[in-house]
UniProtKB/Swiss-Prot annotation:
Keyword Electron transport: yes
Family from the record: Belongs to the DsbB family. BdbC subfamily.
Cited Gene3D superfamilies: DsbB-like (1.20.1550.10)
PANTHER family recorded: DISULFIDE FORMATION PROTEIN-RELATED, SPBETA PROPHAGE-DERIVED DISULFIDE BOND FORMATION PROTEIN B
Any single biological process term in GO: protein folding
Disulfide bridge partners, by residue number: C35-C38, C95-C101
Bilayer topology term: Multi-pass membrane protein
Gene label: bdbC2
Subcellular location: Cell membrane
Keyword annotations of the record: Cell membrane, Chaperone, Disulfide bond, Electron transport, Membrane, Oxidoreductase, Plasmid, Redox-active center, Transmembrane, Transmembrane helix, Transport
Domain of life: Bacteria
GO molecular function: protein-disulfide reductase activity
Protein name (Swiss-Prot/TrEMBL): Probable disulfide formation protein C 2
Amino acid sequence: MEWIRKYHIAIAWMIATSAMLISLFFSEWMKLPPCDLCWYQRMAMYPLVLILGIGMYRKDPRVSMYAFPFTCIGLILSVYQITIQAFPINEMKICSVGVSCTEDYLNLFGFISIPMLSFIGFLVIIILIYIESDRETKE
């Protein structure tokens, strides 16, 4: 647990980077077109790679403050998409053009979809960015 406290921003950065690379893999190599809500979740996740990376490099204690709005927006969007996949009646108008936001391309174990992976990623990043490191508690 001590190493999580020490490297919490680096772990959050690795999760954001992995999420970015996996989403690009699905869309570019697997040719799975992302829906509008997936694009919005990407817009929340991709900047985290830079924000957390720069914050980690500069050892900025305020990096959590910079990353928090993006993680919250992404988390809300992923919860909404999980909801409309479970109950397709509530789909927004933006999801009616192009690829449907209720389309479930990946379904692991019967409940893990791409929006669920996004939700888990954003939630874990939120938890990690608010873990205080030893350096922050000593200052």
